């Protein structure tokens, strides 16, 4: 996602009306946003409801299928709906077809190596693709193309998920890497 922001000059966080400028609903959810291409996030900005200890947010979901990152609940889009969460959670909804690589390592803010283990979250219901971009995390060598790209594709109709061989400056990624794929 960071590379996309750099290469395409598109911020990581976008208001809903950025991709849906003709949708009236996109303008009505002022605190809701897209995080990258995979997530719709709707922070709760109202006090808790008395008796249920939950805050409420009205969420607009564009057409499509969405899965709650934390609860696994599935929602159909093309509508407004109310969501309730306690103070420790907010609605984070993954689009169908999203492929989300994550690390299981605690790297900290001073991390300068690419992770030795990945947990790839794959959200079914639609086709999807993602290119994992990795560089040296230290220099501007990426500006000269010194990086590694690993393409991942989900074909929902065929029920296949493919991780293509990494391409580029392969010494930038660990020689041994554990990959755990989780389907949602």
Ranges and model annotations:
Residues 1-184:
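Catalytic core of carbohydrate-active enzymes
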